[in-house]
Amino acid sequence: MATASQGKVTQVIGAVVDVQFDGGLPPILNALETENNGKRLVLEVAQHLGESTVRTIAMDATEGLVRGARVTDTGSPISVPVGDATLGRILNVIGEPIDEKGDLGEASTRAIHQPAPTFAEQSTTSEILVTGIKVIDLLAPYSKGGKIGLFGGAGVGKTVLIMELINNIAKVHSGYSVFAGVGERTREGNDLYHEMIESGVIKIDNLSESKVALVYGQMNEPPGARARVALTGLTLAEQFRDQSGTDVLFFVDNIFRFTQAGSEVSALLGRIPSAVGYQPTLATDMGALQERITSTKAGSITSVQAIYVPADDLTDPAPATSFAHLDATTVLSRAISELGIYPAVDPLDSTSRILDPQIVGEEHYNVARAVQGILQRYKSLQDIIAILGMDELSEEDKLSVARARKIQRFLSQPFDVAKVFTGSDGVQVPLEKTIASFKAVVNGEYDHLPEAAFYMVGDIEDVIAKAQRLAAQAA
């Protein structure tokens, strides 16, 4: 715009700020700027009230803001720096660096509100993204350019699994990653940053060689920031996809907080709540974000999203709305974590669209279904075992139970990022070895080995070595 229109603050209620303009009103989603305690405060237009007033959502704290303060219309939506200048850096929702490493320098900017790619631009090929984590690669494989949801209640290991995926894929992957911390713990964000420095994902001495950009809007931020920080992260990922033409990884921890912040904003704007108190625009908000995460002819964005499940209820509107957009779901189960099996992935609840013989091949598909079949048989026998004991089972069922218990333990795996908890080095297992190992267990080739040998190891060779160690200790 040639001349920036000026307005003034007329009302401040928490994160909602009303601004009066005597000239024309700025369009919905435009960014307005004012000064608060000597710092730039960005407001996003959410509603038009009458002929001269707009209702806006603040992207930072409004303490100290006064009525009558001057507000400037920037003439465009919130725009953030993108490209190589952001690598190795931590940005906030409006693209300001918050890692005390100085300015970003010359960087091109991009608006955080973008249309989703058109049908003509989208790519439709399916290819497996190997993570090195056995239970995921075998039973619910991730697709390149797909959307993956990590579902779980509080404290079952969503963030640890995301950190392991970043660790594994950054080591073997030449592409870029973007991590959006949406409404999660600042301490975890800090830990993640320092672990990335230690593992070499962020090169602190030469930031331009780093492989990841971080965008944080944590729990202590106002709802406006938490509702927009996922879009800021996605905008960075879109730029990397378009400029490099490679597979970009986009991690969101936690997508539920995006919905939660949207609910807070909706209530502040006076909208009538929908089911369970969520915003009436829940599906629209989620769709606007998720439809932008896709593969185009230029490259792809593979998204891994941690999804907190309130009270472990998968039918809650927030996780239920996320389900519709996902290609693969990794469900983390409290019952499995209580057995000490980590990652606590539920092998029967977790699903993947690409677990199809035409995509992963006949052998992989058949082994995965055989593993699930044995585990399902064990699950259906558990009531009988609890009431009558193992002795009442047929010989065939006893064998199924023994194999299922070995498979259950074999699906556990030590992680690099969890070394501080377990004391053992993490392992990444190639897909071919995962398939071959489970095929042998299903076929009964290792029925003679003890259950304990299958716990927290890599492939079948590690099981044999552990069994020999256990036998030597017992002797």
Swiss-Prot record:
EC nos: 7.1.2.2
Residues the record lists as binding ATP: 152-159
Reaction(s) this enzyme catalyzes, per UniProt: ATP + H2O + 4 H(+)(in) = ADP + phosphate + 5 H(+)(out)
Domain of life: Bacteria
Assembly mode: F-type ATPases have 2 components, CF(1) - the catalytic core - and CF(0) - the membrane proton channel. CF(1) has five subunits: alpha(3), beta(3), gamma(1), delta(1), epsilon(1). CF(0) has four main subunits: a(1), b(1), b'(1) and c(9-12).
Family: Belongs to the ATPase alpha/beta chains family.
Database matches in NCBIfam families: atpD (TIGR01039)
Name by which UniProt lists this protein: ATP synthase subunit beta 1
High-level lineage: Bacteria, Pseudomonadati, Pseudomonadota, Alphaproteobacteria, Rhodobacterales
Gene behind the chain: atpD1
